[in-house]
């Protein structure tokens, strides 16, 4: 089971997406479209806190 926090780049809607796959197959999973505007969802890295925060430089 993998849980991703997704966000729509167009309208900003956040979604928690659960997938029941092996972690080695995570790259094969198709991300869903936004239920409001239909745009392809992307990973939400802004919600990570503490040591897990990804530093963009």
UniProtKB/Swiss-Prot annotation:
Descriptive protein name: Uncharacterized protein MJ0583
Domain of life of the organism encoding this protein: Archaea
Alphabetized SUPFAM superfamilies for the sequence: YfgJ-like
Annotated organism of origin: Methanocaldococcus jannaschii (strain ATCC 43067 / DSM 2661 / JAL-1 / JCM 10045 / NBRC 100440)
